[in-house]
């Protein structure tokens, strides 16, 4: 706890003091983020630092594997769906970023047997990555180099989650109206570089090379 206490003191002295005016404004007027960022819970993925956003810019939803379950019209407890619903319908974000990353533990676990009976939620959750795994195996073959297979699975997973996101009626509607834009990002934790999925080239290209595009990847162009 000592390191956290010292970190908070440093935060107050440096970051908070530097951004005090905008933070107080956000507290008084409320948030109006530009984008919903759906990322992995992995501790090596740090959204605000990765793209140097300001406080209030990103509404962040993180889970294991940056997975998006398909839309289910029920009133059960759905953390990811709730974040999407709130960001799109209440906060009116204009962009959704689904950010996967290299060396993803969730994608690696897709190729491992989960025998621990206590991991019932983990086993079920990982099924959301099965489509990406099968696509990678079809593309490279089951005997392919393991690291190459994992990297491709991570990238295919981003595309799978975009397709799942488009099953949400209110998301699909706004995308078709060009009022909401979806982006697939692939973060390299070893270099800090981000690659962006270009639906025209059907590949991930450096984010630094991408001008903001109005062409949104959907189920037909992926």
Named regions from a protein language model:
Residues 38-40, 62, 99-101, 183-188:
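Short beta-strand segments
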Residues 1-33, 66-94, 105-222:
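Divalent-metal-activated hydrolytic enzyme cores
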Residues 28-47:
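N-terminal low-complexity or amphipathic/hydrophobic leaders
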Residues 44-67:
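Catalytic core of membrane glycerolipid acyltransferases/transacylases, capturing the structured
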């Amino acid at each position: 706890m000592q390191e956290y206490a010292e970190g908070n003191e440093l935060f107050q002295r440096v970051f908070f003091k530097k951004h005090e005016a905008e933070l107080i404004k956000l507290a008084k007027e409320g948030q109006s983020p530009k984008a919903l960022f759906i990322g992995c819970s992995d501790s090596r993925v740090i959204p605000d630092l990765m793209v140097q956003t300001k406080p209030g810019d990103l509404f962040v939803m993180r889970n294991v594997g940056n997975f998006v379950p398909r839309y289910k019209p029920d009133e059960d407890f759905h953390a990811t769906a709730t974040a999407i619903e709130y960001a799109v319908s209440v906060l009116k974000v204009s962009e959704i970023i689904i950010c996967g990353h290299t060396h993803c533990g969730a994608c690696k676990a897709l190729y491992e047997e989960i025998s621990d009976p206590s991991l019932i939620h983990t086993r079920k959750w990982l099924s959301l990555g099965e489509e990406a795994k099968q696509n990678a195996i079809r593309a490279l073959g089951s005997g392919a180099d393991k690291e190459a297979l994992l990297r491709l699975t991570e990238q295919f997973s981003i595309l799978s989650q975009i397709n799942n996101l488009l099953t949400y009626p209110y998301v699909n509607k706004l995308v078709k109206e060009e009022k909401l834009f979806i982006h697939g990002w692939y973060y390299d934790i070893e270099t800090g570089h981000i690659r962006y999925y270009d639906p025209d080239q059907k590949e991930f290209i450096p984010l630094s090379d991408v001008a903001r595009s109005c062409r949104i990847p959907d189920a037909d162009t992926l």
